[in-house]
Amino acid sequence: MDELRRAKVVMPALLAATLLLSVPAFSQQGAAIERGLQAGTGAGVEQVLTQSTDLAGEWTVRNWQSVMERGQGSALGDYLGIPLNDAGRLRAETFDAGEWSLEDLQCRPHPVPYQWRAQGAMRISKEVDPVSRELVAYHVAFVRSLDRAIYMDGRPHPPDWAPHTWSGFSTGRFEGNDLVITTTHLKESYIRRNGPSMSDRAKVTEWLSRHGDYLTVTTYIDDPIYLEEPFIQSVSYKFEPHTELEYFPCTIVNENISNRIPHKLPGKNPALKEFAEQEGLPYEATRGGAETLYPNYREKMKTMKVTPIKSASRP
């Protein structure tokens, strides 16, 4: 009987030890198993088997929330709904659409998190360790982007002085059925294609929530340089097993015959008031800022001067 009791204790311990040795020491799964061992339970092993929702596959964007922005695009000077601070507003006002013709920027990929709102399909694939079968990373690819790795093995983010890229450095973890992604080390880039930008100090958190064949992506940009408070957006995708991510070759050509870098000097952009004039809005309200995000700002708008609407139509 004593030998039977010892076998009941020793065998689970050996099994748990084998599992622990088969995964990297820094992995989330390994840490979960270790906590289960310390508590005298097998909870860690069960967590490894049940903590993830499968997000892999081909997805097509459903831009219901951003149909105007992703159609003809936001007008110059339209910063509605963006919590820009003074520095972010100044950066946006220097924007010149001619920069897209620069050879250095023609093949620039959409940055995180703007790439979620780009047109076309999106592919999520899994990188799995062939021995432990542990999920090492998700890889996300869009029509116009580089491969984006989202590391799931618990590795730390690099130091502040590490290189910044368009996709940054991303790590993920599951909270219930939601994949939560944290991204740092991003290059300065646009958050709306008419000028508003995030700085290279921005930190982006994303929540991927799957409901059957639909995937909701919520993005949260925290930028101490250009934003007064976090900028939050969401976008939807639909699972599409009968599609394939299309090939998108990018060839750089000399489109810009100008001898200058396209930009506007502070206070010298003549087109900034056109949006307010054409839509009958107070110019101050179109400048963005955290205050403009909330419903009670409507009462303040009633006290503002509105420029008479001009008949000129938007391009």
Language model regions located:
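Hydrophobic small-molecule pocket/channel-lining residues, especially in calycin-type beta-barrels
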Residues: 2-4, 23-315
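Bacterial N-terminal signal peptides
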Residues: 11-22
